[in-house]
Every structure is written in C-alpha cells, then in structure tokens.
Amino acid sequence: MGPVDPEFFDGEEMRAALAARDIGTLYRRLRRVGRSQRQLAQWTGQSQSEVSEILKDRKVHSVWVLERIADGLGIPRARMGLSYG
C-alpha cells in the first residue's frame, strides 16, 4: 500500500484523470486533501519544482515517470494503462 488511501483513487474524477494520465488533476486533488508538494516529490522521486510544473498543467509523457508516480503513490498501474513488465 502506498502513502495514499487506495479509496482516494476510486472516485469518478480520479478514475477519469488516471485513465487520461492527467497527473496535474491527480496532484491538485492530493493537494486539496493536505498533501504537500514536498511529499508528492518524495513519494514519486521527482523534484519539488517538477511537481510544481505539473500542478501548473505541464503534461507527463514519459512512461518511466508515470510508472514512478503510480508506484510511489500506490496507484495500480493498470488504472493508468501501464503494464507491470
């Protein structure tokens, strides 16, 4: 289990954001429930400045980064269309 309650990812908005790989929406929702940019960076192996840019709607295209985000936050990779291989 990751640092975020798995039920957080079950809502309709989160399912849609994850399916679209919309990390900006994911991070904004996590910020609204009290997670800091520093925490997000630590959990996902990113710098705080990278998290900040994503919060400003910079898109994440790298599969490797998407996998780190999914794994770091405890999101099942399949929810983001990623494999476990």
Spans of features found by a protein language model:
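Short, basic-rich loop-to-helix N-cap that marks the start of a DNA-contacting helix
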Residues: 58-71
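Short alpha-helical "recognition helix" segments of helix-turn-helix
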Residues: 37-42, 51
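Recognition helix of helix-turn-helix/homeodomain-like DNA-binding domains
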Residues: 45-61
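Helix-turn-helix DNA-binding elements, focusing on the entry/boundary residues of the two helices
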Residues: 37, 48, 66
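Residues within the alpha-helical elements of helix-turn-helix
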Residues: 43, 72
